[in-house]
Amino acid sequence: MSGLLLRLAGPLQSWGERSAFTPVRETAPFPTRSALIGMFAAAQGIARGDTAGLKKYEQVRLTVRVDRPGTLLEDYHTVGGGFPKERTAATSGGSNKDAAVITRRQYLADAVFVVAVTAPDDLTAQLAAALRRPYWAPYLGRRSCAPDEPFLLRRHVEDPEEQLLTGVPLTSPELRDVAGETIAVQFLRERPLFEGGPGAAADAIEVNDMPISFHPHARAHAGRRLYRTVEPVSRALAGPQKTLLTRLIDYAHAEEHA
């Protein structure tokens, strides 16, 4: 097993937890497994209807470091207002809406997450190659939410989860008033830590984001358990914000010169 590292940052992100259309299109407070697996499948050119093609991603383990949770933003959104009925939004029955469709869409503004993707070596290599030259471009939950660069921080590391604790620069302001060599940072893990270890005390939460099918007419997800922890991260990773981009680029390029 090995892995890669992704940095999910941008002006807006939106990680839907429900596949059904509802008046309020909510976002989860962190990247969902469904969205990330969908990103990998799209990068590899796997069609939405290819349910069998998703099986290999069952081997993937995802760990999310919450560098900055962002601010919840809600967009008031209308479709089809001010037009004759034949030009308004279509219905499932083949007709058209009588008036504008009103929805509210939630986003995370200015959020930053770093994701450790752990998988068998061959799958890690396939994912890294696809994310460097994707068949369909990656986005942060919705197509309008493009990721900032650097996006793919490392294509191959032996222990990507350890890099979240000791290697990847942290998007956090300098903490001049906090003593000690570490900073408390929130993580989301797919398996619990060893009892007694740093951050082992976890909140277990139930989420419905295990993708079964992305078929446009038969989307399906299963529930799973996620472990939310607060863990000590090396304070050295939270350097001056004015040098953050340089430090991120240096970290990403260090792999090429190793």
Language-model features: where?
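Short, surface-exposed beta-edge/turn micro-motifs
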Residues: 1, 61, 110-114
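Internal, well-folded beta-alpha domain core
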Residues: 66-258
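Peripheral peptide segments
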Residues: 1-2, 214
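Short amphipathic
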Residues: 3-8
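Glycine/small-residue-rich interface belts in oligomeric ring/scaffold proteins
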Residues: 2, 17-87
